[in-house]
Amino acid sequence: MGERFHARTVRVKAPGKVNVSLSVGPLRPDGYHSVASVYLAVSLYEEVAATSTEAPGITVSISPDSTLDLDGVDIPLDQRNLAYKAAAIMAEMSEKPTGVHLEITKRVPVAGGMGGGSADAAATLLACDALWNSGLSREELAHLAAELGADVPFSLLGGTAVGLGVGDKLSPALAKAQMDWVLVFADYGLSTPDVFRTLDGLRDSEGVEIPEPVDVDPTILQALRKGDPETLSRVLINDLQRASITLAPQLRDTIGLGEARGALAGMVSGSGPTIALLARDSVSASVLAEELTHRGHNALAVHGPVPGARIISDTLL
């Protein structure tokens, strides 16, 4: 008689991110842009529960516990999904992979500029590594993560990091002091490629030569290390912001409202449309989030830095 199959579930959470700084170089011949960015992992997490299945193959579903309103949102559940791709890569690396079902709990906005899909992929890498006893080191997982997308290695790493190249060359930054933010979510997404194309168009129309970014402003890292939101508020930068606002002009109003109601500064997070408002402290963040919510916005107080992908449970069923 064959050995009886016992299903096992490994649950992993991985954080979304805010780009505290994002400088974007000119369009390269390969179609990419070089960037210099400071990533901050924040306390808004995706979760992936990877369950071994007796039948081979990879299946994906979205958990009913997801806090996002996903009506009308097209999330592919096949090989186009980053979590699916991550599981497929791990299956190739593992000696005895089983089938696997991935249940994703969505909390980070889809196409919101916070790396939600990348967090799903990072969580899946870690979950499948544990599920199939692959024994890969964090460094090996990070190498696989880079194959999946520029933001995936950071969600695996977490904390604060400087990203160069296309964002994939990561250097951890020793900045552990808590910074408090209010995230304002939109009820629509912005395509990252569309935002970059819009930026290229704006720059072409201006005829200004854009230098390649080689590093980030050291003042940003100093402010993060010291936990100094006042200084940080003066040096926030996002080269994609004007492109995002060109595509969604209402984002400017949201930033203005946040700053008028007490935020030290506001910016588009990554390619948007999520807005990140920097608060003086956790109390200020909570008050601001509550006020914006009363005004009809979908707002949430978060903090960072937080750790990267972590196993939160491992259960034999």
From Swiss-Prot:
Catalytic activity: 4-CDP-2-C-methyl-D-erythritol + ATP = 4-CDP-2-C-methyl-D-erythritol 2-phosphate + ADP + H(+)
Pathway where it operates: Isoprenoid biosynthesis; isopentenyl diphosphate biosynthesis via DXP pathway; isopentenyl diphosphate from 1-deoxy-D-xylulose 5-phosphate: step 3/6
Keywords: ATP-binding, Isoprene biosynthesis, Kinase, Nucleotide-binding, Transferase
Binding positions for ATP per the UniProt entry: P109, V110, A111, G112, G113, M114, G115, G116, G117, S118, A119
Xref: InterPro entries: GHMP_kinase_C_dom, GHMP_kinase_C_sf, GHMP_kinase_N_dom, IspE, Ribosomal_Su5_D2-typ_SF, Ribsml_uS5_D2-typ_fold_subgr
Gene Ontology biological process terms from the UniProt entry: isopentenyl diphosphate biosynthetic process, methylerythritol 4-phosphate pathway; terpenoid biosynthetic process
GO molecular function: 4-(cytidine 5'-diphospho)-2-C-methyl-D-erythritol kinase activity; ATP binding
Entry function: Catalyzes the phosphorylation of the position 2 hydroxy group of 4-diphosphocytidyl-2C-methyl-D-erythritol.
Name assigned to this protein: 4-diphosphocytidyl-2-C-methyl-D-erythritol kinase
Species this chain originates from: Paenarthrobacter aurescens (strain TC1)
